[in-house]
């Protein structure tokens, strides 16, 4: 266990350094290619992107990691897998709901009334398209953390960042400006979501076997599990 923790911490530490550099490269490229006005609009959207991603995740990725680790420790593989599925349902619902809210309500209010910048409307609306993909990625990263496979988290982050940098740069060069930069982010997260699903289906059965045939889990059981996950996630989302 200690070796797993040390190895996982080292992988995440190295990954964070690499992705921090990647983040600087992204901002540097966008600052050069977009110019002051368009880059300023992009800068306006980034805080709201972070806020909505945090709200959509609902503090559930740490809850997934905690309960998956606990169930796996006592060989309750069916419950570990069910924890992931139940949390994923909650997160996808939140991601879609908050995405729609951002597109049709929050973005217009922010652009016209709060910021007074109509040009920021479409970029802010695109932020709403990011959340459904980001929550899928977050849920599976929580699952990967629960079985101490930190390298899987790094792989999905690499796909996310490379996709975002390459697509955003290409779209901006084509002439789509801030909108193109944000579409690059959408594509980056969508590719990361696909990679996370692929890793979960292909490689995770080694650590969390597929459900046994005699495993039964009623709607009432799922509601109880959902309540447990949400109860754990509330302090996480408040502090986030």
Predicted feature locations:
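Interhelical loop/hinge segments that connect adjacent transmembrane helices in multipass membrane
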Residues: 1-5, 196-240
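Alpha-helical transmembrane segments of multi-pass membrane proteins
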Residues: 115-140, 158
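Transmembrane-helix boundary and interhelical linker motifs in polytopic inner-membrane proteins
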Residues: 2-3, 34, 52-89, 110-111, ...
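Signature of the first transmembrane helix
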Residues: 4-66, 99, 103, 165, ...
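Selective transmembrane-helix segments that form parts of the transport pathway or gating/packing helices
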Residues: 87-99
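Short membrane-interface helical motifs at transmembrane helix boundaries
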Residues: 97-116
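Alpha-helical transmembrane segments of multi-pass membrane transporters/permeases
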Residues: 6-19, 124-125, 129, 143-169, ...
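Hydrophobic alpha-helical transmembrane segments
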Residues: 125, 155-170, 174-206, 211, ...
């Amino acid at each position: 266990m200690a070796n797993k923790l040390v190895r996982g911490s080292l992988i995440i530490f190295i990954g964070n350094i690499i992705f921090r550099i990647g983040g600087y490269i992204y901002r540097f490229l966008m600052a050069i290619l977009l110019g002051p006005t368009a880059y300023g609009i992009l800068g306006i959207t980034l805080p709201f992107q972070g806020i909505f991603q945090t709200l959509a995740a609902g503090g559930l990725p740490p809850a997934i990691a905690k309960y998956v680790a606990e169930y796996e420790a006592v060989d309750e593989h069916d419950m570990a897998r069910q924890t992931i599925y139940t949390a994923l349902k909650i997160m996808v619902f939140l991601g879609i709901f908050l995405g729609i809210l951002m597109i049709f309500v929050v973005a217009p209010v922010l652009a016209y009334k709060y910021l007074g910048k109509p040009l920021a409307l479409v970029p802010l609306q695109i932020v709403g398209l990011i959340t459904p993909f980001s929550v899928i990625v977050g849920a599976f990263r929580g699952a990967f953390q629960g079985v101490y496979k930190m390298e899987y988290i790094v792989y999905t982050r690499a796909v996310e960042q490379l996709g975002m940098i390459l697509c955003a740069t290409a779209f901006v060069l084509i002439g789509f400006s801030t909108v193109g930069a944000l579409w690059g982010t959408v594509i980056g997260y969508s590719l990361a979501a696909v990679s996370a699903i692929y890793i979960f289906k292909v490689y995770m059965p080694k650590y969390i076997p597929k459900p046994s045939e005699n495993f039964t889990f009623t709607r009432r059981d799922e509601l109880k599990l959902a309540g447990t996950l949400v109860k754990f996630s509330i302090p996480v989302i408040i502090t986030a």
